[in-house]
Amino acid sequence: MDRKQILDEKNRIVIKVGTTTITYEETGNINLDKLEKFVRILINLRNKGKEVIVVSSGAVGVGRKALGMEHKPETEAAKQACAAVGQGRLMMIYEKLFNEYSQLTAQVLLTKESITNKECRKNARQTFDELLRMNVVPIVNENDAISVDELAYGNFGDNDTLAANVSELVDADLLILMSDIEGMYTAYPKKNQNARFIHTVVEIDESLEAMAGGSASDFGTGGMMTKVNAAKIATSAGADMIIANGDNIYAINDIMAGKKIGTLFLSKEHGKQMENELAPERAKFRRQVKNLKKSEGKSEEHKTTEFIQNEEYLAGGNDGKLYGNTW
């Protein structure tokens, strides 16, 4: 099963846009041109019969600009105030843009309790189902104005995690994270010229997690570990997930057309199918690695690394799970 076949099946889609995707880096103001293009893409998906849920960051940043704050809020109270001001302004812009296409939207603000409390979760699911049945586009954010990092429930902490939890809650088919990165690499590409881009992940294992969040890795500190954790939530719930760069908002169209944009994390169902397709090549690779480790004169680490970089096998990761840019 190729990527296009997989994506053609998708009907209920959650799309998360990060702050850097919808704002200007220089000023922190909303990028109205890009946001308008994003809305147009969503409308086109709706016209194709897709159900769309948006998870949008940006409330704190928009509120900070509106309040005339030059720097990020340092206290929790200041952050919550910025979120309260910014969320209303952000929704006003979304509503205005969607209204040009006569498309209704609904603001849905969630807390961790909305997901973890059984009764709240049930009500949240019912709300999403009813909104989608009514052809409304839900626009979701964490309720930062009241969310706190406390023991009973805590908070989501970031919208990648929120989007993954929403995907699980609504039984989404696909989660797209539009961020400030192209996708996942085997290493930090700015520091390692041998870093390989991973187009498809069929299994999230310890080796993959190590790539995303090694303690000394700049790559990990850039939020990749958070995205991998989000992928674990989404794929375990049956949704495929894609990380793509939001600089080109039209990448969403390319993704839905089945083009190899970003990194695709396959759900367990699709992952098993891909595992079977890759099994012969992986078995061959592992045999070669095993033989190399038996040879004399080189340390195991050096031998394995040397073999991994062999272009013939397009391999990465000490257990040889990257084949043809598929982990």
Regions found by a protein language model. Give the residues of each.
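C-terminal catalytic "cap/lid" subdomain
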Residues: M1-K72, E76-L104, V108-W327
